[in-house]
Amino acid sequence: MEITASLVKELRERTGAGMMECKKALTEANGDIDAAAEAMRKSGAAKADKKADRVAAEGRLGLAQDGGKAVLVEVNSETDFVANDVNFKNFVDSVAAAALASGANDVEAVKAAKLADGRTVEEARATAVQTLGENIQIRRMVKVDGNNTIGAYVHTNGKVGVLVDLVGGDVELARGLAMHVAALKPPHNKAADVPAEFVEKEKEIELAKMSEKDKAKPADILEKIISGKINKIVSDVTLYGQTYVLGDTTVEQVVKAAGADVAGFKLLVVGEGIEKVVEDYAAEVAKAMQV
């Protein structure tokens, strides 16, 4: 069967692969576009498997929201170059939309979710690996699902995203709080959420830093000094204790003035916790020249 330009074009639109790769697949499938597409999907999965052991610490976040439901997904790539590619951005957005629509609660469920074109997210990921030439992984997802006000924010570079679950208040306040979390990244919501082990460790550190003169003070005075320092530390690591980035009072004061309460928040930072590989290209070239 003749492999026409229109046939190649149609296969490219279906798979996102290069022209020569589409032509080769059509030739091997004797012009059967469905068989060619299926073969390319299998090939894409094989290529994806081969790239799966390469470190993917870059990427971006996808956000999807519908009323009282919102989802953030982290999709990783190997380089920032691919992370900024329009095809990668579109893929990430489609993953977030599928995660929200399917009601997925974890990454495996996200991978099984269907996209608008009928493919699963995992099938589309394998195709993206083939098309973009890098290891691409769907690493994490977080969601807020309820009847509260949601503050959703993804920083313009797509690297930091936040979902705030606000009881009472309005969307403007919720979004402002999400921006605050993105900027200052508090580990905890309120003082009650700070682990007791952390507080005890900080007490030990503050006591060790004190002069012998201060340590010799009466126990009640010493306790007040230590408590003051610990309260400051706890304020620094909690959303409620921090000074609001859009004002000059604490977040707790702002929230209470609005008659609201932050039930919790979700924060994702792309690549957080992944050890990046530092490439020494000079060493690689030198090694290659010795062969």
UniProtKB/Swiss-Prot annotation:
Compartment annotation: Cytoplasm
GO molecular function: translation elongation factor activity
Protein name, as recorded: Elongation factor Ts
Similarity section: Belongs to the EF-Ts family.
Biological role stated in the UniProt entry: Associates with the EF-Tu.GDP complex and induces the exchange of GDP to GTP. It remains bound to the aminoacyl-tRNA.EF-Tu.GTP complex up to the GTP hydrolysis stage on the ribosome.
Keywords for this protein: Cytoplasm, Elongation factor, Protein biosynthesis
InterPro entries, per the entry: EF-Ts_dimer_sf, Transl_elong_EFTs/EF1B, Transl_elong_EFTs/EF1B_dimer, Transl_elong_Ts_CS, UBA-like_sf
Xref: SUPFAM superfamilies: Elongation factor Ts (EF-Ts), dimerisation domain, UBA-like
Keyword Protein biosynthesis applies: yes
Transmembrane segments: none
Gene Ontology cellular component annotations, sorted alphabetically: cytoplasm
Ranges where the record places region Involved in Mg(2+) ion dislocation from EF-Tu: 79-82
Major place of residence: cytoplasm
